[in-house]
């Protein structure tokens, strides 16, 4: 990596159509804040930019359901989420809005520049039009039957039952959500961004980061690149959003697609931050200086938007320029998912713990620490109330809080609240803690985004400090050797300071309270200054003889009793019971036998044994596999919605049951010549039916 003088950290914009939950916090906002606070603690020049994503169809649907305007919807959730972030200690330097005029101006500027260069393509396509409502229908406004699993309530963008990504025109029996009428296909023109034009440049960009990006990010991005990048629409027929800024009849009633608009918020919000800081050109130092570094914190469901699409937009802007060139992200630390009590967070089923509601009951730092210790870096993790209780009580209260309080109380009671001894560097280094190595480990962990390790290292120091104080027994030693007890307490107080510094990025409010108990004026945030590294202070004792601490200690963490989490556990029981009822109802529906058919009707279905010769994922359809089958002497291609449960490699060589005389159809631009049989288990997993036997390929199943 090149020499870096400043760092710009961005976080994926939460959608202003609902409250953020703990899964969002764990995946994006907390790790970003911990990283930013560490960079500040090192004295580095870093800014933290975030904001609300306030455009898109789900917002207009919510507004129509509630009989209010889209602006009312985003105002509500922007306020709610920004306040929840503030209470949680997420320290944005600027938290913007994509509905702001400043953002609209930036997005239009990018559109016009890329349009001026002739990069966009205009394409006429057939989209559904609701004649009753007199408007084109975006994907979420169309519902119908899924062509893969026959779910009658599939949406125009995805079937929630089988997970297949769809387009509205693939639905069977489509209906408009606006009028319940059957929509008709009409021609409409849209602007497209040619991602394929930048394929080679994007491949080189990803290759340059294959050793410093997380493997999941590199692998997922390369899967898309391997499939080949296609043109992607950047406009849609909608009234809510950023209007296409052209004096052109074809631009009327069209807005920028949210995938193009939202990522530009990182730039527009940085511009707005600079303007409010009194220097309208300051943003350029973070976006356009080659010695600046951009880091995008995201969840794994946002990877390609930040490793392919956003970089391609910036490449399009930079093309042919000698100045005003934007930096591409230096790292895109995408997390896995944090689940809740063994299941995925689900807003639609209200199976979630919302951040604002959580903070009404429990302190922010207990949550920050619990999530940091369970950060989903390389695999999905799980938030449970029991684990939260155990970490708060056993680690924060009994280990960290207990040590701090004992140290402050004993100093106040036996040494009049004054540091009683001047510790030397040699004294500091015989504690059993290698401070140079600790600083090196912390720095490596932060720079590699190992959030769990950073929190764990801090708690390891707390355990060592607690052990040192307990084994030294100053309450006994003081009776015979006051100086030895004084030395113990001076070292303990310096350990309190070291813990405040070490754990500041993870539990900043608690670090500030420790800092205040140690007798320092002002806040610990004010102590963290650009150009001065607080982390280097760990190398030597910082509290010297005669320094006065605060006379009163405080309990840093109140233990969480069973009664405190009992309402939450009961709430989970109800949510799980409701989910089980839905699953039981679905199972009951599945167990209802279909109407009786005649034997002649049964004979019409031609079931054959087929062998899978090849398998691959279908482009931009995460749940579909394209199977190449051998059926006797014939070759067939079949699409199957099983990619979530079987890898292509697992399918090759399997014998499957093929519905051989099913009418051919086109799905996602691919021909499917039949259907293979699978069974859905109670857990939702699809299991392919595999006939067993030798030399049965092509044989009819009777």
From Swiss-Prot:
UniProt short sequence motif 'KMSKS' region, positions renumbered to this chain: 344-348
Family, similarity comment: Belongs to the class-I aminoacyl-tRNA synthetase family. MetG type 1 subfamily.
Cellular component terms (Gene Ontology): cytosol
E.C. number: 6.1.1.10
Source organism per UniProt: Chlorobium limicola (strain DSM 245 / NBRC 103803 / 6330)
Keyword Cell division assigned: no
Name used for this protein in its record: Methionine--tRNA ligase
Domain of life: Bacteria
Keyword Cytoplasm attached: yes
Binding site residues for Zn(2+): 146, 149, 159, 162
Catalysed transformations (reactions): tRNA(Met) + L-methionine + ATP = L-methionyl-tRNA(Met) + AMP + diphosphate
Function: Is required not only for elongation of protein synthesis but also for the initiation of all mRNA translation through initiator tRNA(fMet) aminoacylation.
Pfam families: Anticodon_3, tRNA-synt_1g, tRNA_bind
